[in-house]
From Swiss-Prot:
Name by which UniProt lists this protein: Phospholipase D1
Domain PH: 219-328
Keywords noted in UniProt: Cytoplasm, Endoplasmic reticulum, Endosome, Golgi apparatus, Hydrolase, Lipid degradation, Lipid metabolism, Lipoprotein, Membrane, Palmitate, Phosphoprotein, Repeat
Originating species: Cricetulus griseus (Chinese hamster)
Subunit structure: Interacts with PIP5K1B.
Length: 1036
C-alpha cells in the first residue's frame, strides 16, 4: 500500500470516529445523567507519596506543559476544592434583551481563595464540554495521550451531576437562593470527580492553571484566556521591530495576575511567553481611545505597553477593575514612589551582614550555594569559573565555583548567570570563555551575555553589578566579582610562592596538598576537553606567547609612565611569602595571622591566573586557568581590598527582582535567547519572604532598602533610575558627625560640563556647614593611590592612567570646583581639621629583597554617624552614579539595634551594623586588628583624628618614601623632577638592614594621599593619542 493510500485510509477512519462521536453526543439526554455513583474525594491513593505533598514546588514553573496534556499537576495533592455561590447580579432586561444573571462563585483550595463570575450560559457550555469529554473517553483511539486518559478514568464512575434545565428568564428573584444552591451542588460534585476535575475545560471554567497554587508565587489572582496584541516592548537601539502600531498580530494566551507581576502563557505548549512586573508606572486603561481596539484593555509599566482584547466593553471594564483591585490589595508597595526614587521599598527588621575583603564573603557564598534548593542567580562584571571560594584548598575541588555550580545543577537547582559582554578590543576578561565553560557543565545552567554592542548601540557602558542570589531569599550585594584577583583577607599578602597546608599534630599533609593540586589541574583539563601534558603549569612572564589576542606582553607605558618607573625600580625583584612559617628560609616582616591555623608546605592561596598584578600585566590565556602568567618569584601581586554584604527576606526578593527584570529584558532583546531553553524568570511573592530555609550566620536586623543605577539600555525601563546617587547625597547632607568613604574612584564635583554627579559638592557643603556652626565634623576618604584600570578601562597606557589621575585630583584638590577649592576660600588651611585623603600600601620580603606595593582599594562604601551604611558596586563617578551609564546595585542599611558608644566625647547609641563595620575597617587599615590597646570608639575626637588617623597615615607614608621612594610622591611636581627622583638611590637596596628597621615602625596599611604629584603637568590625554579620541565620559 502506498503512503498516499494509507493516509487516505487513516483520514477516513478518523472521520468515521468523529461522526460516530457526534451522533452519540446528539442522542445523550442530560436528564438521565443524574449523580448516582460513589463520590471520590481525592485523586491519589493513601499509599501514593504524592498524597503527602500539600504544595506544588516553586521549581515546577520550569516544567509547565500544554493545557490539554493529561498528566499535568494543577491542584494541590490530597486537597479538596470547595465551591460556594456568593451572590447573583441581575442586569435589567428590556422587551428585546432578556435578563442576565451573573453568579459570583468563591472557591477555596488549601490556602488559596479566589472568585470567578459566570453566567448560566457558561455553566451550560461547560456542561456540554464535559459531556463531549465523557463520550470521547469511551472511544478507544490508539494514541498515547488518549490511552493514558482512559486508563486513569477506568475505575471511576461515569455518572455526572445534572444541571438545572429551566431557563434563566423564568427565574424570579425569590428563587435565586434555590438556583444558587443547585449550581453550588453541581460544582461541588464535579470537583469531587478527578475524571472531570482534571479536564482542561474544568480548569478554564475555574480560572486555574499550573501556576495558580504555587505557594511562593503568593495569593491566587485573576486568570483567564485572552487575546493579546504583539509589540509594545521598549527596546532601545536599532531593534525597532514590533514598535509600529500597524505591524502587529493577535494571539490567544492565558493571562495570570499575581501580587507583583502578571504573565501570559501559550495554551498549546504551556510556555511562559512574557512577564510584566508591577512598578510605579503600572497603569490600566480601558476603551478604544486608549487601546485603538474595540473592547480593548491596556496595561502599562516601565518596560511595555500590553494591549488585550476582551469579549465586550463590560468584560474589559471588569478585567481592568479586578486586576487593579488585586494589585492594590496585595502589591501596593510596588506602585509607590519610594525614597531616593528607588524601585524598592524600605523594609524594617531585615537580616543583614557586612564583609571586609573576600575571604568571608566567598565562604558564605559557597555555604549558601550548598543550601540552594531551587534557584541560583549570579551577575558579575567578570566571572572566573575556576576560582576557589574556600581557601586554603584542603578539600580538592569541592569549593571551586564551577564544581559547586555543577553539583547543584545535578541536584536539580536551576542556575541563571548574566555576564557583561565586553568590547573585546578594550577588555580582556573573555566572557565568552566563561559562558562556554559554564554552559557545558549541565543543562540546568543558563548563561546570558549583554549588551550586543551593534544592535543596542551600547559601546561605552557596562553591567557593573556583582550579585549572588540564592532561592530569592538570600542575596549577596557588594563590589566583589567572583573573579581572579579578588580573594583576599586581612593580611593583604604581596606574594604566594607556595604557602598553605594545615598541619595537625604528628601528621604531615604534604601528600594531601600535592594530590589536591594534581586533582584540581586534571579536573580543569578534563572539564575543558583539552590536553596540556607538555605545558608547564608555572610560566614566567616571558613564556607567554606574545601573539595571543588580548595583550600578550607586559604593558608598555610612555617614556615617563608612572608605573614603568615604579616597576623598573622595585617590582621586578619583589615578591614575598607572608603566610609561611617562621622556620622557613624566607620570611615576611609582617606577622602571620591567616585565620586558618598554622600553615606549612607548598599549597597556594592564589592558583594560576588568580595570582595577578593587573598594572604590571593584563590577564592573558584565560582558557588556561591554572597556568601562571606572572612570575610570582619576581613580581608581587596587588592586594585587593573590598567590601560586601548579604541580605535576607524581602530585601533579597528586591535584589532578585532586579536580576529577573534584567534577565527577562535580555531574553526579549536578543533573538538567540528567545527559545524555551532560556525561560522567563518569575519573582517570588513578598508574602512568603519571611520563610527562610537558610540564614547566613552573624546577620543582624536593620532597616534596609535596595538602590540601583538602571536605564533603558540596561534594564529596559522607560525612565532611568539614579537612586544610589540620591542616597549618597542625602546621607552626606544629613550626617551629623562624620562620614567614612572607601571607593575605587573619586571623580565628582559637578561643573555641569564634564562631571555631573554632586557627591563631592555635598561633602564640601557639609564641611562648610559644620565650620559655620562651630561643629566638630570629620570626613575620611580612602581610595587607591594610583588608578588600577581594573574596572572600566584596560588599555594599559600611561595616558589613560594619567587621565584618571587628572579627574581624581580635580575632585580632591585641583581647581576651583574641587573640594579643597570650595573649602579654602572660607577655611584657609583649617580644612585639614575636617577631611583626610588616604590610600593603602604594604610591604614584604622575599629572597632577601624588600618589596612594596599599593593595596588596591576596590570598595564602594559609605558609613555615616555609626548608624547608616551604603554598600554596593557603584563607584564615585558619573559612570556609576548617573543611572544612564553603567548599571549598578547597592544597599542602604540603617541600624535599628544599638550599642552604647562614644561620639564627639559624649555618650552615643551606635548601630550594631554600622559601628561594627567601621571599627573593622579602622582596625584593619590602622593595624589594630590584634591589638585592642587603642580605643577607636570615637571617630570624631581630636585625639583619634589627629593623633591616630592623620599621624599614622603621615608616618607610614614618610617611612615608605624613605625606604622605597614610592610613586606617586609629593616631591615630584613635573616630569623633570620625576627623572631626578627616580635616579636617586633607594634605601631598601643600598642598606636593607636599616630599611628593615625603619619598616618595623610601620603600623597598618594607611598612607597619606600625595596632593602635589605632577601638579604642574596637564594629565589629560594629548592630542593625537588614541586616549584623546575616546569620549570624555569614558573617564568620568
Amino acid at each position: 500500500m502506498s503512503l498516499k493510500s494509507e493516509h487516505r485510509v487513516n483520514t477516513s477512519a478518523l472521520q468515521k470516529i468523529a461522526a460516530d462521536m457526534s451522533n452519540l453526543i446528539d442522542n445523550l439526554d442530560t436528564r438521565e445523567l443524574h449523580f448516582e455513583g460513589e463520590e471520590v474525594e481525592f485523586d491519589t491513593s493513601p499509599g501514593d507519596p504524592k498524597a503527602q505533598e500539600k504544595y506544588i514546588p516553586f521549581s515546577s514553573i520550569y516544567n509547565t506543559q500544554g493545557f490539554k496534556e493529561p498528566n499535568i499537576q494543577t491542584y494541590l495533592s490530597g486537597c479538596p476544592i470547595k465551591a460556594q455561590v456568593l451572590e447573583v447580579e441581575r442586569f435589567t432586561s428590556t422587551t428585546r434583551v432578556p435578563s442576565i444573571n451573573l453568579y459570583t462563585i468563591e472557591l477555596t483550595h488549601g490556602e488559596f481563595t479566589w472568585q470567578v463570575k459566570r453566567k448560566f450560559k457558561h455553566f451550560q457550555e461547560f456542561h456540554r464540554e464535559l459531556l463531549k469529554y465523557k463520550a470521547f473517553i469511551r472511544i478507544p483511539i490508539p494514541t498515547k495521550r488518549h490511552t493514558f486518559r482512559r486508563q486513569n478514568v477506568k475505575e471511576e464512575p461515569r455518572e455526572m451531576p445534572s444541571l438545572p434545565r429551566s431557563s434563566e428568564n423564568t427565574i424570579q428573584e425569590e428563587q435565586f437562593f434555590g438556583r444558587r444552591k443547585q449550581l453550588e451542588d453541581y460544582l461541588t460534585k464535579i470537583l469531587k470527580m478527578p475524571m472531570y476535575r482534571n479536564y482542561h475545560a474544568t480548569t478554564e471554567f475555574l480560572d486555574v492553571s499550573q501556576l495558580s497554587f504555587i505557594h511562593d508565587l503568593g495569593p491566587k489572582g485573576l486568570e483567564g484566556m485572552i487575546m493579546k496584541r504583539s509589540g509594545g516592548h521598549r527596546i532601545p537601539g536599532l531593534n525597532c521591530c514590533g514598535q509600529g502600531r500597524a505591524c502587529y498580530r493577535w494571539s490567544k494566551r492565558w493571562l495570570i495576575v499575581k501580587d507583583s507581576f502578571l504573565l501570559y502563557m501559550k495554551p498549546d505548549s504551556g510556555a511562559i511567553a512574557f512577564v510584566l512586573l508591577v512598578d510605579k508606572e503600572f497603569r490600566i486603561k480601558v476603551g478604544r481611545k486608549e487601546t485603538e481596539t474595540k473592547y480593548g484593555l491596556r496595561i502599562d509599566n516601565l518596560s511595555r505597553t500590553l494591549i488585550l482584547k476582551c469579549n465586550s466593553y463590560r468584560h474589559a471594564r471588569w478585567w481592568g477593575g479586578a486586576i487593579e483591585e488585586f494589585i492594590q490589595k496585595h502589591g501596593s508597595d510596588f506602585l509607590k514612589d519610594h525614597r531616593f526614587g528607588s524601585y524598592a521599598a524600605v523594609h524594617e527588621n531585615m537580616l543583614a551582614k557586612w564583609y571586609v575583603n573576600a575571604k568571608g564573603y566567598f565562604e558564605d557564598i559557597a555555604n549558601a550555594m550548598e543550601e540552594a534548593a531551587e534557584e541560583i542567580f549570579i551577575t558579575d562584571w567578570w566571572l572566573s569559573p575556576e576560582i576557589f571560594l574556600k581557601r586554603p584548598v584542603v578539600e580538592g575541588n569541592r569549593w571551586r565555583l564551577d564544581c559547586i555550580l555543577k553539583r547543584k545543577a545535578q541536584q536539580g537547582v536551576r542556575i541563571f548567570i548574566m555576564l557583561y559582554k565586553e568590547v573585546e578590543l578594550a577588555l580582556g576578561i573573555n566572557s565568552e570563555y566563561s559562558k562556554r565553560t559554564l554552559m557545558r557543565l549541565h543543562p540546568n545552567i543558563k548563561v546570558m551575555r549583554h549588551p550586543d554592542h551593534v544592535s543596542s548601540s551600547v559601546y561605552l557602558w557596562a553591567h557593573h553589578e556583582k550579585l549572588v542570589i540564592i532561592d530569592q531569599s538570600v542575596a549577596f550585594v557588594g563590589g566583589i566579582d567572583l573573579a581572579y584577583g579578588r580573594w583576599d583577607d586581612n593580611e593583604h599578602r604581596l606574594t604566594d610562592v607556595g604557602s598553605v597546608k594545615r598541619v595537625t599534630s604528628g601528621l604531615s599533609m604534604g601528600s594531601l596538598a600535592a594530590a589536591t593540586m594534581e586533582s584540581m589541574e586534571s579536573l580543569s583539563l578534563k572539564d575543558n576537553h583539552r590536553s596540556h601534558k607538555n605545558e608547564p603549569i608555572l610560566k614566567s612572564v616571558d613564556d607567554v606567547d606574545p601573539k595571543l589576542k588580548g595583550v600578550g606582553k607586559p604593558r608598555k607605558f610612555s617614556k615617563f609612565s608612572l608605573y614603568r618607573q615604579l616597576h623598573r625600580r622595585h617590582l621586578h625583584n619583589s615578591d614575598s611569602v607572608s603566610s609561611i612559617d617562621s622556620a622557613s628560609n624566607t620570611g615576611s616582616i609582617r606577622s602571620v595571622q591567616t585565620g586558618v591555623g598554622e600553615l606549612h608546605g607548598e599549597t597556594r592561596f592564589w592558583h594560576g591566573k588568580d595570582y595577578c598584578n593587573f598594572v604590571f600585566k593584563d590577564w592573558v590565556q584565560l582558557d588556561k586557568p591554572f597556568a601562571d602568567f606572572i612570575d610570582r618569584y619576581s613580581t608581587p601581586r596587588i592586594p585587593w581590598h573590598d567590601i560586601g554584604s548579604v541580605l535576607h527576606g524581602k530585601a533579597a526578593r528586591d535584589v532578585a527582582r532586579h536580576f529577573i527584570q534584567r534577565w527577562n529584558f535580555t531574553k526579549i532583546m536578543k533573538p538567540k535567547y528567545r527559545s524555551l531553553s532560556y525561560p522567563f524568570l518569575l519573582p517570588k511573592s513578598q508574602s512568603t519572604a519571611h520563610e527562610l530555609r537558610y540564614q547566613v550566620p552573624g546577620a543582624v536586623p536593620a532597616k534596609v532598602q535596595l538602590l540601583r543605577s538602571a536605564a533603558d539600555w540596561s534594564a529596559g525601563i522607560k525612565h532611568h533610575e539614579e537612586s544610589i546617587h540620591s542616597a549618597y547625597i542625602n546621607v552626606i547632607e544629613n550626617s551629623k558627625h562624620y562620614i567614612y568613604i572607601e571607593n575605587q574612584f573619586f571623580i565628582s564635583c559637578a561643573d555641569d560640563k564634564v562631571v555631573f554627579n554632586k557627591v563631592g559638592d555635598a561633602i564640601a557643603q557639609r564641611i562648610l556647614k559644620a565650620h559655620r556652626e562651630g561643629q566638630r565634623y570629620r570626613v575620611y576618604i580612602v581610595i587607591p593611590r594610583l588608578p588600577g584600570f581594573e574596572g572600566d578601562i584596560s588599555t594599559g597606557g600611561g595616558n589613560a592612567l594619567q587621565a584618571i589621575m587628572h579627574f581624581n585630583y580635580r575632585t580632591m584638590c585641583r581647581g576651583e570646583n574641587s573640594i579643597l577649592g570650595q573649602l579654602k576660600p572660607e577655611l584657609g588651611n583649617q580644612w585639614i581639621n575636617y577631611i583626610s585623603f588616604c590610600g593603602l600600601r604594604t610591604h614584604a620580603e622575599l629572597e632577601g629583597n624588600l618589596v612594596t606595593e599599593l593595596i588596591y582599594v576596590h570598595s564602594k562604601l559609605l558609613i555615616a554617624d555609626d548608624n547608616t551604611v551604603i554598600i554596593g558596586s557603584a563607584n564615585i563617578n558619573d559612570r556609576s552614579m548617573l543611572g544612564k551609564r553603567d548599571s549598578e546595585m547597592a544597599v542602604i542599611v540603617q541600624d535599628t539595634e544599638t550599642v552604647p558608644s562614644i561620639m564627639d566625647g559624649k555618650e552615643y547609641q551606635a548601630g550594631c551594623f554600622a559601628q561594627g563595620l567601621r571599627l573593622q575597617c579602622f582596625r584593619l587599615v590602622l593595624g589594630y586588628l590584634s591589638d585592642p590597646s587603642e580605643d577607636l570608639q570615637d571617630p570624631v575626637s581630636d585625639k583619634f583624628f589627629k593623633e591616630i588617623w592623620v599621624s599614622t597615615a603621615a608616618r607610614n607614608a614618610t617611612i615608605y618614601d624613605k625606604v622605597f621612594r614610592c610613586l606617586p610622591n609629593d616631591e615630584v611636581h613635573n616630569l623633570m623632577q620625576l627623572r631626578d627622583f627616580i635616579s636617586k638611590p633607594i634605601l631598601a637596596k643600598d642598606d636593607p638592614i636599616r630599611a628593615e628597621e625603619e619598616l618595623r615602625k610601620i603600623r597598618g596599611f594607611l598612607v597619606q594621599f600625595p596632593f602635589y604629584f605632577l601638579s604642574e603637568e596637564n594629565l589629560l590625554p594629548s592630542v593625537g593619542t588614541k586616549e584623546a579620541i575616546v569620549p570624555m565620559e569614558v573617564w568620568t
